């Protein structure tokens, strides 16, 4: 909102406008977030339209990271703009004034299509049946390995991805490679029995074994290859695929690396489905420049397409983009900095569900999977996350 | 489809595969189109899924220009892959074999959401009422001036654009500039009574007069400014808007110019809604590079969002992209080459609806509006379009 020109009629209005303008600036400053005032405005608008609303839902609808939303919400509570009730965040009378008189909000309806949840496509019976099968298999997944930025998409998400590939003509008769597949998108894809060939490269043997068991049981064919993507693809995977699908680590170098391996698989041209986190503009801009420099065009970008299980603090919702490539060229950055934990080391605190003891994960113990409590407990819940400052 | 490796069991299959592969190559070569084999595959897939289907619908679903689709369809008819019935294009038995045995198509359902037609948003009652008003006003539009690439979006399209702006938080309390508005998107936007300020710059006085009449009659405020966008914006429009909306000429220079004028209006940061034609990859890539170089990020891109009236040959459906800008900088190319007619001069043939005489438009007579038949007829129908080769 650009504040320009005449400031209304009376003195009262001038004061209120100035007061709210200063308040907005202060909140943005205190929250210290890349998107500044716009993010604060977005959060207030979403609460105004959907209150009472949970912090997680605010994050989904604003496409802002959950910790940012939580921080802004706390500051807004202190400023008496918001109050927290059992059912979620609500605007106070002051907050309502702020929303209506200053931000000029008045209408509360959401126009997002309820049939498709804004994705633009829906599952028919055939894909619904596939989803039901995927749900069963997804329960057998191992625990996430956060050191390699694992974070599992919901079975619904992976099935919608397969449906989107079908709808756009990128599934029937096509050779498809999954560049990393902790999301198990190869499962619904294989269950369609539409692809000419499906292959998965992943560094995590646990994921590959699950996919192999699945293939055996369901009578489908998925080639699995254990491979560290920091190294070039094996020769027999090169230049033989029509389509690749990836949900890489959410760093610029992670994106460049995974897409480059995808390009090795595609050769000079092909289609890439990229799932990626909503990012602050500066980072977003480097990412889009990297994408176009590799020779990919963004032919479609659907926000809030992907939802994830478990670690909702890290990734609650991301977009999917369909990239069309011609004269593709690989572009690999610093392969040592691809995981977010390496860029910004993170300590996670887990609570033992048996005795309640708090454990640190991220220094000596690297993965929650390696954690065993002194009481013998093996189930934990993440309660806090902390970024370590880089030296 | 990459054709690799083993070619099946028997001799018959080898021959068929080879035959169809040669056929696909030949059709793509004869059609001489930028997207090559993929475009031909896309056309066959859309016919397979939706037959019988009109050429216009094929163009919409494949996002290919109508003349290209018509050309490929004619070649496919000659090759006995397609037949034309009263109800549209259908595959022959040979075509079905081609689709099922070679392209490996088998499933025919469309997963595009029928509620929102793939747009991801729907109009509620409030916006439906607005649409009904816009429909009435749209009937009063002048004839399109094709020398400045006019082509009117449907009232539904312009109302959906306003709805999208609302849904994304870019309407309430915002200052919005329409950089060119032959689509009359300012009308539904103003009817919401949500914006802080609405302004329109356009070179066509007829459009501005209609908007002025509308504002007077409907009691809304839209500032209209007659302006040739090849010149910088008037000083009092600079750096005062939060959001711009544009559907520029579909040339790289047209896009750069219109977005740059938008940046003058926004200042360092802001939101842009860009409607633009689905283009062949090479051109698309220059366009996306131009967008990111100006400092805009594509935060969302919805294909087939916009539909146009009348000149369906030129533009049947285009996408809308929501761009978010930070540290924006203008980037103006060759302002003399912004209109497609100047890049590739086009002759249009119009038939008088009274006497049937055919008239040429594009050389001496520049606009269909200037055309009067010797019989006195003033209503014409475009029947053919021809590109002149540039010297």
Swiss-Prot record, chains A, B:
One of its GO terms (molecular function) is transferase activity, transferring alkyl or aryl (other than methyl) groups. It comes from Methanocaldococcus jannaschii (strain ATCC 43067 / DSM 2661 / JAL-1 / JCM 10045 / NBRC 100440) (Methanococcus jannaschii). Disulfide bonds: none annotated. InterPro entries: BpsA, BpsA_C, rRNA_MeTrfase/Polyamine_Synth, SAM-dependent_MTases_sf, WH-like_DNA-bd_sf, WH_DNA-bd_sf. Gene3D superfamilies: Vaccinia Virus protein VP39, Winged helix-like DNA-binding domain superfamily/Winged helix DNA-binding domain. This is Uncharacterized protein MJ0675. GO terms for biological process: polyamine biosynthetic process. Pfam families: BpsA_C.
